[in-house]
Amino acid sequence: MDVVARLASQRAVVIFSKSTCCMSHAIKRLFYEQGVSPAIVEIDQDMYGKDIEWALARLGCSPTVPAVFVGGKFVGTANTVMTLHLNGSLKILLKEAGALWL
């Protein structure tokens, strides 16, 4: 989990993704459309991808991708992120983390 914590704390928003996952694509698109430039970790293309996926599963990510971290803290997977977006909470989290300037 150390590698996940280290990567998650490097930017205001970090998305652990798989390049072939449609939900990962949708979540990345959501953040781009909000004006956020997240760090993207494509675990299927990372040499430590299996270790990262295992660590995400231990955090409770099911499915393991997309896993979204804001301000170094695990926010959730696609369902949670979409819920936060729809109820307006996601923008608040992004502002607090310094990822969004509006």
Swiss-Prot record:
The protein's matches in Pfam families, at most eight in alphabetical order, are given as: Glutaredoxin
Q: Which InterPro entries match?
A: GlrX-like_pln_2 (IPR011905), Glutaredoxin (IPR002109), Thioredoxin-like_sf (IPR036249)
Q: Which Gene Ontology BP terms does the record give?
A: negative regulation of transcription by RNA polymerase II
Which locations, inside or outside the cell, does it occupy? Cytoplasm; Nucleus
Lineage, top-rank taxon, reads Eukaryota
Renumbered to this chain, motif Responsive for interaction with TGA factors spans 99-102
What main location does UniProt list?
cytoplasm
Q: Name one GO cellular component term.
A: cytoplasm
Q: Which residues form the Glutaredoxin domain?
A: 1-101
- Amino-acid positions noted as binding [2Fe-2S] cluster in the UniProt annotation, renumbered to this chain: C21
Q: Name one GO molecular function term.
A: 2 iron, 2 sulfur cluster binding
Q: Which UniProt keywords apply?
A: 2Fe-2S, Cytoplasm, Iron, Iron-sulfur, Metal-binding, Nucleus, Redox-active center
Reported function: May only reduce GSH-thiol disulfides, but not protein disulfides.
Q: Which PANTHER family has this protein been placed in?
A: GLUTAREDOXIN
NCBIfam families noted in UniProt = GlrX-like_plant
User: What protein family does this chain belong to?
Assistant: Belongs to the glutaredoxin family. CC-type subfamily.
The protein in question is named: Monothiol glutaredoxin-S10
**Classification lineage:** Eukaryota, Viridiplantae, Streptophyta, Embryophyta, Tracheophyta
Q: Which gene is transcribed and translated to give this protein?
A: GRXS10
